[in-house]
Regions:
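Short, solvent-exposed turn/loop segments enriched in Gly/Ser/Thr/Pro and often Arg
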Residues: 1, 48-57, 118-123, 146-151, ...
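Solvent-exposed beta-hairpin/edge-strand motifs
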Residues: 403-415
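Conserved, mostly hydrophobic/aromatic
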Residues: 9, 37, 105, 116, ...
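C-terminal beta-strand-rich structural cap/linker in extracellular carbohydrate-active enzymes
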Residues: 420-451
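Conserved alpha/beta catalytic core and glycan-binding cleft of carbohydrate-active enzymes
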Residues: 131-132, 137-293, 297-299, 379-381, ...
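Substrate-binding/active-site clefts of carbohydrate-active enzymes
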Residues: 1-109, 122-138, 142
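Loop/helix patches that line or flank the sugar-binding groove of alpha-linked glycan CAZymes
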Residues: 233-403
């Protein structure tokens, strides 16, 4: 099991230690692990599951004060977690327990961020208290979570820390299922396609995701989809992702929804999806192994893939490192996109106002094409302007560019901070690919023509 059966919230899982039967070994080895990761420039976020407990009758909460720590509907226990029970975060001592627990992990283990499982089961005031307490430890600690519940909760909807209420919180983020489903199709319909896999009329959904679910005058919500509302108050509240440990991997989803397409075309779709992810405003999140076309095979499944592998063996859940050598172009593409994003602060604007003032969508484009420019008037930005184009069509399109000469840093094959060539007036964007260009950036390194 993935570890969503919490018993003692403040104790490290023993199965990862060399000696789980001695508590000090668990503690010391986890601290050593985090220290080593920090020494290598890697921050550590922890998935926390305060929304339910593994057992109810035998839990320490229930034994301490029966029924106080759990929500009920009449004589029945509410099950907003989908796991048999849900904790009552709105009650003073449950709220205090959650706040004390995250502060303990932050101070004792130096955890850098907390990802709240089924955050919608928790009330808004508790999440505000979590943010306030962690700010006193370190304001840079991340707080984000799943902005939904796992079932019907007894907590009134207006009090739930769901995605649609996230604007009422400060510096607390939520996963964007809008960009997830917009890129690849619904996770609940294996055959449903998205922008990169051939679904028409997804342009507005992608534009909505590009601005991190914040208000923008050029985004028409009625065309973006039923779920799309400006739920994000600031771009940092939108956790953008295509796949995570839940549901099908990105590659497996494409294998099912686009089974009739060639593997080469599905690789293009994967690259285009990653380009949308890493050039959108907000916080990019990726599943480990996505850069190597991670798959979760399951011969017993009707599709051949595992979409809910919480209890599946290593044969399914392990990262197939041997496959990296077969898909180095995809791996290097992800590396290049990450490097480009890190190099350009205009892709990481911190306020909705900055996005509104600096990001302009191009008009008069072909169907299934999204394009926009960003003015370089963002603190730390080295380019005067950035242009981003996504082509969801199987065929090439031509897009007119603003005046001047542009350096191409990302195309359908390569990505990074080096110029792959220049364009002026207009540019051709290959089918199922992205093109990212910069203007007036002296930091761009030129790539020899034969290497472009």
């Amino acid at each position: 099991n993935w570890g969503y059966d919490p018993k003692n919230y403040n104790v490290p899982e023993g199965s990862y230690s060399t000696d789980p039967y001695h508590g000090e070994v668990r503690v010391n080895e986890m601290k050593q692990m985090i220290k080593t990761l920090h020494e290598n420039g890697i921050r550590v976020n922890m998935d926390v599951v305060y929304n339910h407990t593994y057992h109810l009758a035998d839990s320490w909460f229930q034994k301490t004060v029966p029924d106080y720590y759990y929500r009920k509907n009449g004589d029945h226990y509410s099950d907003g977690s989908g796991c048999g029970n849900e904790t009552a975060s709105e009650r003073a001592m449950m709220r205090k327990y959650i706040v004390d627990s995250v502060v303990y992990w932050a101070t004792e283990y130096h955890i850098d961020g907390f990802r709240f499982d089924l955050m919608g089961v928790h009330d808004l005031d508790t999440m505000k208290a979590v943010r306030k307490a962690l700010d006193q430890v370190n304001p840079d600690i991340m707080v984000y979570g799943e902005g939904w519940t796992g079932g019907e909760s007894a907590l009134p909807a207006a009090q739930q820390a769901t995605k649609n209420n996230i604007y009422r919180l400060d510096r607390v983020g939520a996963f964007s299922d809008d960009i997830r489903d917009g890129i690849k199709g619904s996770v609940f319909d294996f055959l449903d396609k998205g922008f990169v896999s051939g679904k028409d009329n997804m342009e507005e959904n992608i534009k909505f995701s590009v601005v991190a679910a914040t208000p923008h005058s050029q985004v028409t919500l009625t065309k973006a989809g039923d779920k799309c509302t400006n739920w994000s108050g600031q771009p940092g509240q939108s956790i953008n992702y295509i796949s995570c440990h839940d549901n099908l991997t990105f590659w497996d989803k494409l294998a099912i929804s686009n089974a009739d397409d060639s593997e080469a075309d599905r690789v293009k779709m994967n690259k285009l999806g990653s380009a949308v992810l890493f050039t959108s405003q907000g916080v990019p999140f990726m599943q480990a192994g996505e850069e190597m076309l991670r798959s979760k095979p399951n011969e017993k499944s009707e599709t051949g893939f595992d979409e809910n592998s919480y209890s599946s063996p290593d044969a399914t859940n392990s990262i197939k490192w041997d496959n990296k050598g077969n898909v180095m172009d995809v791996y290097e593409y992800y590396k290049g996109l990450i490097a480009f994003r890190k190099a350009h602060s205009a892709l990481r604007m911190t306020t909705a106002a900055a996005i509104q003032n600096n990001l302009t969508f191009m008009t008069g484009l072909d169907a299934n094409v999204v394009a926009y420019t960003i003015q370089g008037e963002v603190q730390g930005e080295t380019a005067q302007n950035i242009a981003v184009i996504y082509n969801g069509n199987p065929d090439a399109v031509t897009v007119n560019l603003p005046a001047g000469t542009w350096d191409i840093c990302v195309n359908g094959k390569k990505a990074g901070c080096r110029s792959l060539g220049t364009a002026e007036g207009s540019v051709t964007v290959e089918g199922i690919s992205a093109l990212v260009l910069v203007q007036g950036d002296d930091t761009v390194n030129k790539v020899p023509a034969e290497d472009a």
